[in-house]
Curated annotation (Swiss-Prot):
Recorded consequence of changing S29A: Devoid of antimicrobial activity; keeps full lysis capacity
N2-succinyltryptophan: residues carrying this PTM: W25
Keywords, ordered alphabetically: Antibiotic, Antimicrobial, Bacteriocin, Lantibiotic, Thioether bond
Name used for this protein in its record: Lantibiotic subtilin
Organism, scientific name: Bacillus subtilis
Record-linked NCBIfam families: lantibio_gallid
Modified residues ((Z)-2,3-didehydrobutyrine): T42
Length: 56
């Protein structure tokens, strides 16, 4: 592994006692208020555009 010393992947070893996996990023919705699970609740377009109005 000495060939890969120039890469810092921010990997941390944990013991088996502390092996609970927790996400570092949590969110109720991607960016649209009122759409709790984002794209899964049929508001994919609003989630995709962050509830912005697009006009000519």
């Amino acid at each position: 592994m000495s060939k890969f010393d120039d890469f810092d992947l921010d990997v941390v070893k944990v013991s088996k006692q502390d092996s609970k996996i927790t996400p570092q990023w949590k969110s109720e919705s991607l960016c649209t208020p009122g759409c709790v699970t984002g794209a899964l609740q049929t508001c994919f377009l609003q989630t995709l555009t962050c509830n912005c109005k697009i006009s000519k």
